[in-house]
């Protein structure tokens, strides 16, 4: 494993920005100093003032492996991820077959070990008949346990109150919840079909999967967690009203936490007019007021982490009528450049973005030696280059297997110039390094 010396960087770490050099050896950060001299590293990079940040740890991706090779795989999506500044990911269980057994979990780990250029971990799924397996899980073997309290891609809905009570009482590790109230969604869909017939527009999606459906389910999850003392992490909040369910306190003082996803921070319901089904996702992208409330909540401790919820589908699938078009969109390749638009617009400080995409994710999932720029930690690093004139997304190749992006019309004011994964050069000067090998994430619980 080659040694790497990064000079003249603007390091962003633990609420501070400072100028300095960073040395990597045997995959780990061995020295951080204002100036490092007398080292003969195999690779030397002059950052020329670029931001040097810990790589994004994405707590929610759907890489479609196994089961949907036309949409994605660990090979294709991990390469898109490192191009977008993501050095570690945690994959969701709604694959084909679903990750509902130890055998399926082992198979996913094997697949990722062969082909992923990013570090990897896996969430275990919940069904109506695998609670004994869930209760017996080793917390160090999984990133978390995922329950779909609302119907979504993969048909893994769990809404029986007795099963939910037992799950929240017995789950041995962090429980991640997709929260939408399916009966409300079904009733809303029936009303919209009465209005539009078979020609429901994509703009109706946030009316069908509306704020009330989200709040109803999120409230239920929080109530269950409080009753049973469950370590709960509610995924992809989309509404201002849900924010009141979560405490504005440091992560170390909470047992109930929340994630927001980048598309819910960057799009709102006005974008359905131009993007249609391309931004159809569950839960739905909602109003500008909701988007702005989510942005404000990131400035406090009410929202703990930012994920992508990368969920690719083929272009042809997305061209179907609304009812038949699947929910989800590809996001990892443009994750950090897109989020850095919030920094460029003075919505978020760069230190807050780094905290919510790296520091807090490592803390929340008990991932040791990652997520920070610290001596002795794994060198999961990203150099961010300013692009004053903007970089047109349409002029860049799409690395995700699905071959499209909702950001096709955007120009980003920052780019990822270099990504190191566990000390290995994964992405540099718009080129992938296929010899990079991601490592399994460890969870110290």
Which residues fall in each region the model found?
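Histidine-rich, glycine-flanked metal-binding segment
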Residues: 1-54
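Short catalytic-loop micro-motif centered on adjacent basic/acidic residues
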Residues: 90-91, 121-124, 231-236
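Divalent metal-coordination and catalytic microenvironments
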Residues: 9, 22, 27, 49, ...
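A glycine-rich helix N-cap at a beta->alpha junction
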Residues: 110-126
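C-terminal cap of metal-dependent C-N hydrolases
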Residues: 9, 321-324, 375-442
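His/Asp/Glu-enriched, well-ordered alpha-helical/loop segment
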Residues: 199-229, 278, 299-306, 311-387
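Metal-associated gating/positioning segment near the N- to mid-region
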Residues: 47-115
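Histidine/acidic residue-rich metal-binding segments in metalloenzymes
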Residues: 132-147, 153-306
């Amino acid at each position: 494993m080659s040694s790497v010396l990064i000079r003249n960087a603007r390091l962003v770490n633990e609420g501070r920005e400072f100028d300095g050099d960073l040395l990597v050896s045997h995959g780990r950060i061995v020295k951080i100093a204002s100036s490092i001299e007398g080292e003969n590293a195999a690779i030397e990079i002059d950052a020329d003032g670029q931001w040097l940040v810990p790589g994004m740890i994405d707590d929610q991706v759907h890489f479609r492996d196994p089961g949907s090779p036309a949409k994605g795989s660990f090979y294709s999506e991990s390469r898109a991820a490192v191009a977008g500044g993501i050095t570690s990911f945690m994959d969701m269980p709604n694959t084909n077959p679903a990750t509902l057994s130890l055998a399926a979990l082992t198979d996913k780990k094997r697949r990722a070990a062969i082909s992923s250029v990013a570090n990897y971990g896996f969430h275990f799924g919940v069904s109506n008949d695998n609670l004994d397996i869930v209760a017996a899980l080793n917390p160090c073997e999984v990133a978390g346990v995922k329950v779909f309290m609302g119907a979504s891609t993969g048909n893994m809905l769990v809404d029986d109150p007795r099963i939910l009570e037992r799950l929240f009482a017995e789950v041995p590790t962090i429980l991640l919840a997709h929260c939408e109230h399916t009966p409300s969604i079904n009733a809303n869909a029936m009303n919209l079909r009465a209005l539009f017939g078979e020609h429901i527009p994509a703009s109706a999606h946030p009316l069908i999967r509306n704020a009330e459906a989200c709040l109803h389910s999120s409230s239920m999850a929080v109530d269950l967690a409080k009753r049973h003392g469950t370590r709960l992490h509610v995924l992809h909040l989309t509404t201002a009203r849900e924010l009141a369910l979560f405490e504005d306190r440091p992560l170390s003082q909470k047992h109930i936490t929340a994630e927001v996803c980048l598309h819910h921070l960057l799009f709102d319901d006005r974008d359905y007019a131009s993007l249609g089904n391309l931004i159809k996702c569950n839960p739905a992208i909602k109003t500008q007021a909701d988007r702005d409330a989510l942005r404000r909540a990131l400035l406090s401790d009410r929202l703990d982490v930012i994920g992508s919820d990368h969920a690719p589908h083929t272009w042809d699938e997305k061209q179907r009528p609304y009812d038949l078009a699947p929910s989800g969109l590809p996001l990892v390749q443009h994750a950090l450049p897109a989020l850095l638009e919030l920094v460029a617009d003075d919505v978020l400080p760069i230190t807050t973005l780094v905290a919510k995409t790296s520091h807090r994710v490592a803390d929340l999932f008990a991932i040791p030696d990652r997520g920070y720029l610290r001596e002795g930690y794994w060198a999961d690093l990203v150099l961010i280059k300013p692009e004053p004139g903007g970089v047109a997304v349409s002029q860049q190749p799409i690395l995700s297997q699905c071959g499209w992006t909702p950001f096709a019309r955007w120009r980003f004011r920052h780019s990822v110039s270099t990504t190191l994964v566990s000390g290995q050069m994964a992405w540099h000067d718009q080129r992938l390094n296929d010899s990079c090998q991601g490592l399994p994430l460890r969870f110290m619980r």
